[in-house]
Amino acid sequence: VEIVSVTMDTPRHRCTWRDVFRRTRQLANALTAAGVKPGDRVASLAWNDYRHLELYYAVSCMGAVMHTVNPRLFPEQLEYIINHAADRVLFIDPTLLPLLQVLQGKIPCVERIVVMTSDEAMPDAVKGKLPSYESFIAGHSDEFDWPTFDERQASSLCYTSGTTGHPKGVLYSHRSNVLHAYAGCMGDAVGVSARDVILAVVPMFHANAWGLPYNAAMTGTKLVLPGPKMGDAETLVDLMNTEGVTMAAGVPTVWTLLLNYMAQTGKQAPTLKKTLVGGSAVPLSMIKTFEEKHGVTVLQGWGMTETSPLGTVGTLRPDMMSLPAEQRYQMHAKQGHGIFGIEMKIVD
């Protein structure tokens, strides 16, 4: 089963879950050699690709805490959260290196910076000054003795913008990530299975990409990661068609761009069966367009960074399936029902 990634150094990189597991152990050894210990925070400023996926697993499984940083935040916010988290190592995508110039001298907690590319593709501005990801893991064993620790130990760290003041840090435990992965694979939730091919457009720096990297590993699902092209409709449609994508996940603005592109070009995505949409309310017109013109079911989800993050999903009950189309669309426009593990209370 493949993980397909768009990166700056490889337009269409392919690897298997076996490869990811092997390189994850190499990365864990490299981090250990760099002095990273259980409980330490390791940050990423990166898009969705296979190297970021390896970071997800290496950092958390060695007992450290994976801190995915949103590169779209204001520089002052980036400075604050990196220092607040006390990140010791920072992995950065080469396309985001200009952020380093803004942060230079302002993040003293960071002891090491690694550029997420190969030596051959290193930008001239940092060549010889910073290590590439590939040189960082090169030469390290692909065997690693994973430690045993309490399931409630911190696994990953995301910052939520909140409503006032600075962004707030939310720690995910290993337990919450595993339970969320189980819940997401249930048929009446997202229904991720080994028969799917998932296009994760939702960023890996946004609430753990809604848990999809864990769902995919749990089920052995083919995962398609669009890298820095996550907002490019032409690339997304091409990935859907060449990789046989059956399910995609992202915010409404992405799907607006995609639907407009498909309408203008006449292109289709015949293998796509459903989209998981969250982040903001889904317009009823989008639900109708997806279903009537493309045969795609829209699953609207609601959640928060604090809920790991999925809280509800809009799958239909059996008695709703026979409703007229307009009424079904109205149901899909709602936030749906709570998923396993979520306690909810409706307050008037």
What are these model-derived regions, one by one?
Residues 2-49, 53-57, 74-79, 129-135:
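Conserved AMP-binding/adenylate-forming core of the ANL superfamily
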Residues 32, 50-69, 78-79, 185-188, ...:
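Hydrophobic alpha-helical segments in the ANL/AMP-binding
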Residues 31-36, 140-152, 157-199, 211-212, ...:
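Conserved adenylate-forming
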Residues 33-34, 61-135, 149, 251:
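Structural core segment of the AMP-binding/adenylate-forming
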Residues 46-49, 70, 192, 201-206, ...:
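Conserved AMP-binding
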Residues 178-197, 207-246, 261:
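Conserved AMP-binding/adenylation subdomain of ANL enzymes
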Residues 218, 245-250, 259-330, 343-345:
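Gly/Ser/Thr-rich phosphate-binding loop
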Residues 41, 47-67, 71-75, 83-89, ...:
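A short helix-loop-beta submotif of the ANL/AMP-binding
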